Amino acid sequence: MSILHVTILTVFPEMFPGTLGYSLAGQALHNNIWSYDIINIRDFGLTKHKNVDDKAYGGGDGLIMRPDVLGNVIEYALSLNHNTKIYYPSPRGSVFTQSFAKEMLKNKNIIFLCGRYEGIDERVIAEYNVKEISVGDYILSGGEIPTLTILDCLIRLLPGVLINQNTLSSESFEKDGEFQGGLECDLYTRPKIWHGRAVPSILLSGNRKLINNWRKEQSRMITKLRRPELLKDL
């Protein structure tokens, strides 16, 4: 049985697993560390045309996904996995972060409702206690790409996905890690000199204490310059 099971509700089932079928996520899928089901929302559509949307009350441009259709889809999904949490990628949602990802993984069964068109009827969110989640202050065509992004983050946190699980502690945003929630330091590899640019000599010194201090100071400088709001937590 997989550590994490995901149910994805979408009108474009062919978009999955997409990039999650490759590299670390793909290998983890093959090894059954995580698993997923796809439910095609159109299978629950109305009329012979399988309509899932309609005009908005109160006017406005765009079509809204119907609550009766989505309700039937969600009820079916919940019948397969009772103990689960429903997430809806939306620009109105709480911003997805590394800490948010860890919180999500407290549930071993997760449902993603991928919206399309102008969005979904608000009553669906209220009825099923749906958690809206945002991947940033920009608009995409639907919820599938944010779902892929969020899942990639979740999957690499699962035990057995990374060859060396300790690498997680030296990444950006890890509050309990080397950089204490800040951005990662600059990274270098061979050759020592490339296009006239040399690797910082301290990294070649072999002095682990000096190197660790350099890495932490670099992290603070980069965080202060690029993401100063993160420093309040440091």
Swiss-Prot record:
Keywords in alphabetical order: Cytoplasm, Methyltransferase, S-adenosyl-L-methionine, Transferase, tRNA processing
Signal peptide coordinates: none
InterPro entries: Alpha/beta_knot_MTases (IPR029028), tRNA_m1G_MeTrfase_C_sf (IPR023148), tRNA_m1G_MeTrfase_TrmD (IPR002649), tRNA_m1G_MTases_N (IPR029026), tRNA_MeTrfase_TRMD/TRM10 (IPR016009)
CDD domains recorded: TrmD-like
One GO CC term, this protein: cytosol
Pfam families tied to this protein: tRNA_m1G_MT (PF01746)
Positions with a binding annotation for S-adenosyl-L-methionine: G115, V135, G136, D137, Y138, I139, L140
Molecular-function GO terms, alphabetical: tRNA (guanine(37)-N1)-methyltransferase activity
This protein's record includes keyword Membrane: no
Top-tier EC class: transferase
GO biological process, one term: tRNA N1-guanine methylation
Cellular compartments annotated: Cytoplasm
Top-level division of the source organism's lineage: Bacteria
Subunit structure and binding partners: Homodimer.
Family: Belongs to the RNA methyltransferase TrmD family.
HAMAP family per UniProt: TrmD
Name by which UniProt lists this protein: tRNA (guanine-N(1)-)-methyltransferase
Organism: Rickettsia typhi (strain ATCC VR-144 / Wilmington)
Name of encoding gene: trmD
